[in-house]
């Protein structure tokens, strides 16, 4: 779904001033990635980058070119896991948060057994 510029600006502005919102963006991006919602994960990452460190500072911190970072989180981005993790790690450090994975059982009717 295409977002209007004003909505993106609103998200970016809120991320700049709200630590809990920044943490939630990172959490949602990671959850989207784990759920296979890669377009959503990239979009959330882009919002988080724009609302926190910005692409120039992220490029310096991760030693990845700005244009590569922008492509990574763009609509057709296909970041390597190594680069994605490097970006997440830096965003977490900048936001002062860390992540952990919690494994939970699925509903019995939603998975197949061998």
Task: Give residue ranges: language-model regions.
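General nucleic-acid-binding
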Residues: 1-19
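Short, Lys/Arg-enriched anionic-surface-contact patches
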Residues: 22-48
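Short alpha-helical DNA-recognition segment
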Residues: 50-70
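The DNA-recognition helices of helix-turn-helix-type DNA-binding domains
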Residues: 52, 76-77, 91
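Short coil turns linking two alpha-helices in DNA-binding domains
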Residues: 65-68, 76, 80
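Short, charged recognition helix plus adjacent turn
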Residues: 77, 97-114
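DNA major-groove recognition helix of helix-turn-helix/homeodomain DNA-binding modules
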Residues: 81-98
């Amino acid at each position: 779904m295409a977002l209007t510029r004003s909505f993106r600006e609103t998200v970016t502005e809120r991320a700049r001033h709200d630590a809990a919102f920044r943490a939630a963006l990172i959490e949602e991006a990671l959850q989207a990635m784990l759920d296979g919602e890669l377009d959503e994960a990239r979009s959330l990452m882009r919002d988080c980058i724009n609302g926190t460190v910005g692409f120039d500072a992220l490029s310096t911190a991760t030693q990845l070119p700005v244009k590569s970072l922008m492509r990574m989180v763009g609509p057709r981005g296909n970041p390597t896991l190594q680069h994605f993790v490097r970006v997440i790690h830096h965003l977490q450090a900048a936001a002062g948060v860390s992540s952990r994975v919690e494994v939970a059982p699925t509903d019995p009717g939603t998975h197949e057994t061998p």
